[in-house]
């Protein structure tokens, strides 16, 4: 299964600086999307891009807050795990 951390702290202290879906390697075709409260896509990852999010959008750190993720596993199951992740400074 997947483990989806509920928060991370992208403050470059070497601890929890990125949000990474644990177990995603079992789903090589999965697509990960993260949206802000307004519904704007702020992170997208597929098999050709990094599989973790550092809390930035267009090179700028995003503010504290709750963001919504959606993971299309692309494994034929139709499962699309959804939830929230918080950025905390």
Predicted features along the sequence, with ranges:
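Short loop/turn motifs at secondary-structure boundaries
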Residues: 1-89
């Amino acid at each position: 299964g997947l483990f989806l951390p509920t928060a991370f702290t992208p403050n470059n202290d070497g601890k929890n600086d990125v949000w990474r879906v644990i177990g995603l390697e079992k789903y090589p075709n999965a697509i990960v999307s993260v949206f802000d409260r307004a519904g704007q896509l702020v992170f997208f990852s597929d098999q050709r891009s990094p599989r973790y999010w550092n809390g930035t959008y267009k090179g700028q750190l995003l503010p504290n807050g709750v963001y919504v993720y959606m993971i299309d596993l692309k494994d034929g199951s139709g499962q699309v795990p959804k939830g929230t992740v918080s950025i905390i400074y």
